[in-house]
Amino acid sequence: MTRITRHLIFIGILALLFAAGIWQDGTVAQDTKIPALSELNEDEKITEKASLGARTWIIPTPVWVIGSYDKEGKPNVMTSSWVGICCSKPASLMTCLREATYTHGNIMERKAFTVNIASESYAPYAAYVGRVSGRDVNKFETTGLTPVKSALVDAPYIKEFPLVIECKLTQTVELGLHTMFIGEIMDIKADRSILSEEGAPDIEKLKPFVFTPGSSKFYGMGKLVGNVSDLAKEAEKK
């Protein structure tokens, strides 16, 4: 069998897989049927976990609104949920953005960004700024939110959002479709109304919300589960 023949056979197999909806970009096809719980027998309900494929379904994810300036100095914000703390010394966080986003170019240009965390009452604003591009609209003008120029980094933050993290870009990591931006935390600013007696942000006062990939919904934080050290002791007894 010649190399060309083998190549044609391989292409034919791939075409059949695509037609059958079995393979898409190395993952299970989006419309692959996941058995309903009612379709499983009692043993399967206990032992079986459904295979969901290689997806970005980490449940839940934070809702961060990233602030930046474009090269003309226009303030912009966008919502990102692919985010997190990545180092304690120096205190640093990261967010991952596609190159196609307006914010990606802004951060590369200005070497800075802010993270703005909203209370539940501002959920509509977080949803909106994550669905339109700063190339097309001035999001501060359309929402009525107020941009504030940071005194520490070359980026704006949102006055109305109660918790703000100001970051200086220190590293970029190309990961494929997304770029990881690592920012050193220069300062955290918080409305005094959300602080505990100890001076730390109080989650019950802040009332943040989270995002659920797959369903594309925001959820509030719910009730207190318990103190971590107390819960750990309970598990040890069991």
Predicted features along the sequence, with ranges:
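Basic, polyanion-binding surface patches
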Residues: 26-238
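Bacterial N-terminal signal peptides
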Residues: 11-20
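Bacterial N-terminal signal peptides that target proteins for export
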Residues: 1-11
